[in-house]
Amino acid sequence: MSMQDTVADMLTRIRNAQMARKVSVAMPSSKLRKSIADLLVQEGYIASAEVTDEGNGKATLSIELKYFEGKPVIEVIKRYSRPGLRQYRGKDAIPSVQQGLGVAIVSTSKGIMSDRAARAAGIGGEIIAFVA
């Protein structure tokens, strides 16, 4: 059986690993997952993300999680747009997460970017998830 929502699976794996105080989490890789992980590294929510090839044609994305004083850096990680109800917003309607303290992950025509970068570039897109 194929996975229907790979982004929700990724976010759930990260959330569960942080609740269990794991150092890292591994999952099947895809271009979308890698782009989201790179954005989370850039924004400082995770320590690192790297793709390793297992030789059988399947790549694995390994994410090293971040903690501050024993608590996970990511307090909230939530899927917003989902396969059954896509959420698209124009450049002026991109939501701010926790009054700018969090980040909304936006899929635009220029690739995956944060809400701040999308507003600065003047483009809207699909609001994938919220992280704070």
Curated annotation (Swiss-Prot):
A Pfam family recorded for this sequence: Ribosomal_S8
Residue stretches spanning the membrane: none
Role this protein plays: One of the primary rRNA binding proteins, it binds directly to 16S rRNA central domain where it helps coordinate assembly of the platform of the 30S subunit.
UniProt protein name: Small ribosomal subunit protein uS8
Record note on quaternary structure: Part of the 30S ribosomal subunit. Contacts proteins S5 and S12.
Organism of derivation: Psychrobacter sp. (strain PRwf-1)
Family: Belongs to the universal ribosomal protein uS8 family.
Disulfide-bonded cysteines: none
GO molecular function, one term: structural constituent of ribosome
Lineage: Bacteria, Pseudomonadati, Pseudomonadota, Gammaproteobacteria, Moraxellales
InterPro entries linked: Ribosomal_uS8, Ribosomal_uS8_CS, Ribosomal_uS8_sf
Superkingdom of origin: Bacteria
Coiled coil: none
Keyword tags: Ribonucleoprotein, Ribosomal protein, RNA-binding, rRNA-binding
